[in-house]
Design a protein with these regions (language model features):
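ER/Golgi luminal nucleotide-sugar-dependent glycosyltransferases, focusing on the catalytic module
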Residues: 1-408, 416-685
């Protein structure tokens, strides 16, 4: 069979991700001609990689989304040449593959004689249409894989379909004018079709997103990327269990790193953690032994590590460290890990031992003491914030990331047995007034990082098991804490501004950031480098604008710069290609779940049944767009769903028409306003 393949590619950051190469390389043996059409720029290095599995690469402007790319690819091949193919596959970058051999589905499809086209998956009919003023979204093949046979390629109607395609400028346009239209359009012209994995086998309208594990069990070779960054509330409504999809992909033999190193650039942190099941209840194990749970190598054979403990100025900070049992907790770490204490003021040997449980030498108590394996050392840093975050990123990176200074790609001196790790621990006081809830949150964070030798060994092994894991943060607590509105604490604007300044490629969570509680976490040094460089630039610019060190420190404190950097810790790691995980002990998992389940039941007792309905119900009454119309819509949807479904097409038609009229009136008004205006007059006056 003479088979061609047109692969649409787009990446907002102008990268060709490894999963794209994996998919194309696996398809190369099954296609006589591979054309990649990219709506985003391709660098020389990526082009060289693509040339190993593509015959042609067509780069074009980002116009028309996938529809524009397919049309450009067909025109590039030539309409007359299309008839030379027995089959032409139109496919794209929206999936990971192969999770099963292509041969299985291609061999099965080869037996479908007499058809004009076939698809990999399909979407069921939906009534009413989910977003248009129509009664129904028709059943249709999904556009991420449509294989067109010679019979349709040679039909002039195929060319006419593409050349008369309406302008496509949005995801909904693509669904309306191509994906949901292609199947029915050509079926009405007498062409027959097949689907490899019919929707009738499954219990949802969109199994590619809502039942992806079931598709994999049935042998589907591809996994839709959207399943990992789709709205978690939608997935919850469809009973999609976060984590099962990633587990199913790994069980099928696909690389977890290929998936997570890509999706971190698309999903927000919270969506990714929920959809991929990245909240870990760490199982303890015996260090240096193989237990029933996590298998652990000898501590002497582990990658090297460094723990940086920040002690604020004042005697009460040392006393707080003792009250936290910090010395006992630090004993949970492998003995060869280095312990570095940072503080704005010198600490004597007795204080260092009280805090760390390790006996320092006279040299270790100097303001910038040398350090070797297994010792405790002191570094006196500038007092720029209560938790020493800025100092950790700007004055201590040579301690936790020695590889960067040597020009290495990865930090540490691990002898090739994995990256070095850094553990960051802070001691109160926290910014602002203290409450019992703050004490609980601080204790929970310490437990989730330094609960016991077995637990901490399991946490270290988590990084060995997942090479793409960049930062592990204590799971978010909620006991005794307020949950009023977005939890960026007034720093959302500053976080967005600094994110742009740092060149972060990920989208910040709109409501609640994924941030390390108490600025405590375990991480790979490489995952912190972007944040460290950004903090250094921030300090440098502040010092240039200030009269002296005291004024620059005051400006950083007034701008809450350290808090913003803490909020961006996870997002900076994701922008570097690392994924985050939330970690907690089994004891805290039980405590938090029990309290949260009770809160959920009490809060939702008088709300609609499902969480997505509850959110819409509350937003209609208390959200930024609350109003009578929103209340009526949610009331009808909840109490009279059949009536709501019947009225939606008419409602969309009327509101859509009103919007069109409003836009037309505005445009006409502007034209009338300009009548008689002298040429060259400023229209902004």
């Amino acid at each position: 069979m003479n088979r061609g393949l047109v692969y649409f590619h787009f990446d907002p950051h102008h990268q060709v991700r490894d999963y794209v190469l994996a998919a194309l390389s696996s398809l190369r043996p099954h296609a006589d001609h591979v054309l990649l059409v990219s709506n985003s720029p391709i660098g020389d290095a990526d082009r060289a990689r693509l040339e190993t599995c593509c015959d042609e690469i067509l780069q074009r402007p980002n116009e028309g989304l996938d529809v524009g790319a397919y049309r450009a690819g067909l025109e590039h091949l030539g309409w007359e040449r299309l008839a030379d193919f027995d089959e032409l596959i139109l496919t794209n970058h929206t999936y990971y593959a192969p999770l099963h051999p292509w041969e299985e589905v291609l061999t099965r499809a080869a037996g479908w004689e007499g058809i004009s086209f076939w698809g990999m998956t399909e979407h069921a009919a939906m009534r009413p249409h989910p977003f248009l003023a129509r009664r129904e979204l028709p059943r249709h093949l999904q556009s991420h894989w449509i294989a067109v046979r010679h019979r349709l390629l040679a039909d002039p109607a195929f060319r006419e379909y593409w050349e008369r395609m309406p302008a496509v400028s949005s995801y909904r346009d693509s669904i309306q004018w191509h994906e949901s239209r292609f199947t029915g359009h050509f079926a009405e012209l007498g062409h027959t079709w097949q689907v490899a994995f019919p929707v009738d086998r499954y219990r949802s309208a969109n199994p590619a997103i809502e039942e992806a594990p079931a598709l994999l069990v049935d042998g589907c070779p591809l996994l839709k990327r959207r399943a990992l960054f789709h709205d978690p509330l939608h997935q919850d409504r469809q009973a999609v269990v976060g984590g099962e999809l990633l587990e199913a992909a790994v069980e099928a033999g696909y690389s977890e790193d290929l998936i997570l190193s890509d999706v971190v650039h698309t999903a927000t942190a919270r969506d990714l953690i929920v959809n991929a099941g990245l909240t870990e209840v760490v199982t303890g194990c015996v260090p240096g032994a193989v237990g029933a749970g996590v298998q652990t190598s000898s501590p002497a054979q582990r990658s090297s590590g460094c723990v940086v403990v920040h002690i604020p100025a004042g005697r009460e900070a040392v006393e707080r460290a003792e009250a936290d049992g910090l010395a006992r907790r630090l004993a949970s770490l492998p003995a060869h890990w280095r312990v570095v204490v940072t503080s704005p003021e010198p600490l004597d040997a007795a204080d260092l031992e009280r805090v760390t449980g390790r006996r320092p030498t006279q040299e270790d108590t100097e303001e910038d003491s040398a350090h070797g394996e297994g010792d405790v050392s002191l570094r006196v840093v500038r007092d720029l914030d209560p938790r020493g975050t800025i100092a950790f990123l700007t004055q201590c990176d040579d301690l936790w990331d020695p590889g960067r200074g040597a020009g290495g790609d990865e930090g540490g001196d691990d002898g090739g047995d994995g990256d070095a790790l850094v553990l960051r621990i802070t001691v109160g006081p926290e910014p602002g007034p203290k409450t019992r809830a703050d004490d609980v949150a601080h204790r929970q964070a310490l437990d989730c990082l330094l609960d016991s030798p077995g637990y901490t060994a399991g946490l270290i092994d988590l990084f060995a098991q997942h090479p793409g894991l960049g930062v592990a943060v204590p799971a978010a607590g909620h006991i005794g804490q307020a949950h009023a509105g977005p939890t960026w604490d007034g720093l959302a604007g500053a976080a967005k501004a600094l994110s742009r300044r740092l060149g972060l490629t990920v989208e910040l969570d709109p409501l609640a950031p994924v941030a390390p509680s108490g600025a405590m976490f375990m991480a790979r040094p490489a995952a912190l480098r972007t944040l460290s460089e950004g903090a250094k630039e921030l300090v440098r610019l502040t010092e240039q604008a200030a009269v002296g060190p005291e004024q620059s420190a005051e400006r950083l404190k007034r701008a809450r710069a350290a808090e913003v950097l803490e909020l961006l810790t996870v997002y900076a790691a994701m922008s570097s290609g690392f994924h985050p995980r939330e970690v907690l002990t089994a004891a805290w998992a039980g405590r938090l779940y029990g309290a949260l389940a009770y809160k959920h039941r009490v809060v939702t007792a008088d709300l609609p049944d499902h969480t997505d309905e509850q959110v819409r119900f509350l937003q209609a009454r208390f959200g930024p767009r609350a109003g009578v119309g929103a209340r009526v819509r949610t009331y009808v949807d909840v109490h009279h769903p059949d009536m709501g479904s019947a009225l939606k097409p008419a409602y969309r038609y009327l509101t859509g028409g009103a919007s069109d009229l409003a836009r037309a009136a505005t445009s006409a008004g502007r034209r009338l306003r300009d009548v008689g205006r002298p040429r060259g007059e400023d229209k902004g006056d």
